[in-house]
Amino acid sequence: INIILENSLSVYKVDVRKLKELNPDYIITQAHCEVCAVSFSEVENIVSKNLNKNTKIISLQPNTLKDVFDDIKRVAKELNIENEINNNLIKSLSERLKKIKELSSKQKNKPLVACIEWIDPLMIAGNWIPEMVGIAGGENILGKSGNNSHWVKFKEILNQNPEIIIFLPCGFNIEKTKEEVKYLFKQNSEWQSLKAVKNKKLFIADGNQFFNRPGPRLIESLEIFAEIINPSLFNFNHKG
């Protein structure tokens, strides 16, 4: 899988037979990452060769939470359910986000948080993740809101010495991530010197189900961040 990542190849493939069987009117895809999902160009190519010309492709490429909200509205408009989505889903998501922001803003101390999107080689999460960490009451390190996720050396994490570390790799469930993190720590004992590890503030999250997929579940992801960063303020029952 590392070779796939290093060469920016997708770990997913389109089931052409199933797609032809379904014969959809709309296909929602993304042009954000060619590793985490099938590339936009591949989807276009498959659709042009196997489906009728009336099939419409809706491609999303968000970088921030605002972009994600805008994309939800755009999809709703394309599907002619704009009023329903704006009055229900968007309203609900916005209210949940606002409550977290208001409560976490009262905290004076913002712990340093490292969000790791890939384990070998190490990749720091970007795009909407740094923004979400900030809303939840933390100070994100190494990643910048709106910028792409990027590779880092362990020394960079060591120098920042984060108080909280969250592993949320794309494509792995929690059990697989646990295995990878254990192996990572065996390979480099210096991880044990970090504040987050010493103080038992190292967390593993399901990046595949949450965090890395730009959609409504990012608000659930924000709630998970809030519980991790400010457990005395938030309890959404996501821990498990």
Language model regions located:
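N-terminal ligand-binding lobe of clamshell/alpha-beta domains
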Residues: 1-240
